[in-house]
């Protein structure tokens, strides 16, 4: 079928009402009065109301020849330039309602051609084992979060773009829109390169942007000379030194006077304040097919790390670490990470960072997998699964079981199927023959209903957890099982299975967790709560502002302090881990995601404004959790 051009795509200027000529220009009004409710994550616990600036055009105003039935087309192709990396919503309005996806243009400030698969408006993906893999869909110059609403595209009325809580009145230019059955490719149509030798977005302008290696070295030198351990009252294990409970030589949990705490190996009360991904591991980005985007790549003769590794193509953070530390750059960067943690009041890492300077850590076990795996659910009833669970636990835990610095281990992260149980059952039935499929067919022989499909999936999940937990306990009886880090909002019956763990972990992307929901969670599980992930980001450096947006770095610090102190005042709280240590690459990780959420940016520098809030929160943490001090009450500005 021949592609249909929008040769007369007319957009109205927001402020003036003038008709655009060659380039159609809209302004997202940061003072928009229209407000809409959105979930903070994909389908999370709360709906929040935000100002929304939307621009919508009926099809007849765009092109009278455009059909209303788009179901026979495969791609919506637009040429667009956003002035910002802040995401916008691409919306299709039909007779049945509104369809949408989140659109993230890398960097901003350049023209791109975006070929958007129309299937992403019609149904939720089943590809991927965790939430991010299901939702995130990358293209060369942008990425999409396919989160819905979904529906048929047979009775299209209008097309719209909308931005939630615009920061600084950003603009959007559109010069071409068409439908196509062929993928014309998604590309940058402007001057290249767009990423400099330090991994920064060239068109972006912001305070502190690196202009030279000399500037960067001066910043590094200043940090190295000024970085000293903070005064948080921590003992060698990161517990509160002037507290005392029973010492067992390993971390454990205990409820004292109605409040839950970790207890460190020496018997000190402990709240786990950590960051995911701490260390020298790079935030690589895909180069293949995008070689012209980058002004330079790490040269082959860079000094090797202690591991023998050299930064590879796309690893701009590793390149900057090699510039900073020279030979052995990875171990030196990990040692610096521990120094930073001590200065900022962080007490939990993801792994052993330095043998010379130990710090507690929580590790993620590689989950036993037996193919096929559907949205994170393996063939749990097969003999192979039980054998794999045993061998996997043995290989990973044997060397850790006597390490007093190990807080505990997670056994999974954000499985994608909770809330989609009947759909998962359908995938198992339609897939290859497995023991799980055989048991499902036998179970449904007595009646095939959505409720029974859901019942089977929940029973299978409980079986999976019991097998995995038993294997882990067999090879490590000393450490805490921190459970699966659930994401979004699983059904109550899924969360209730948290009773099988020592600690219930949940990734909670909110401005602070809802007290009633946390209380409900504790009633379901009876376990202390460890927040596995949370964060706040800004759209100011060429990256998207993460799942939870705030206006700038100062507001990030305020948001951190508000979140941490509010949740610390809840009795079931035992810790919170930020995601993540390092900003994602400006041109995205492998699934496209390019969030600005790090404690550290690609040039290995931290924001002092952000850290002010972090340090202030950590100094008050014990007294807030003990109920001696009221939590911080100032909320951050979103825009």
Question: Which residues does each PLM region occupy?
Answer:
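Extracellular ligand-binding interfaces
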Residues: 50-147, 152, 168-170
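Substrate-binding cleft of secreted/luminal carbohydrate-active enzymes
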Residues: 406-408, 412-413, 534, 548-599, ...
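Short carbohydrate-recognition loop motifs
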Residues: 36-58
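Active-site-adjacent substrate/metal-binding segments within catalytic domains
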Residues: 205-362, 372-405, 452-459, 467
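Aromatic-rich peripheral "rim/lid" segments of glycoside hydrolase catalytic domains that contact
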Residues: 425-437, 441, 579-639
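Short beta-strand-plus-loop segments that form exposed binding edges in beta-rich domains
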Residues: 160-168
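Extracellular glycoside hydrolase catalytic/binding regions
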Residues: 293, 297-300, 347, 442-562
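Aromatic- and acidic-residue-enriched segments that line the glycan-binding/catalytic groove
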Residues: 275-291, 358-371, 401-404, 411-445, ...
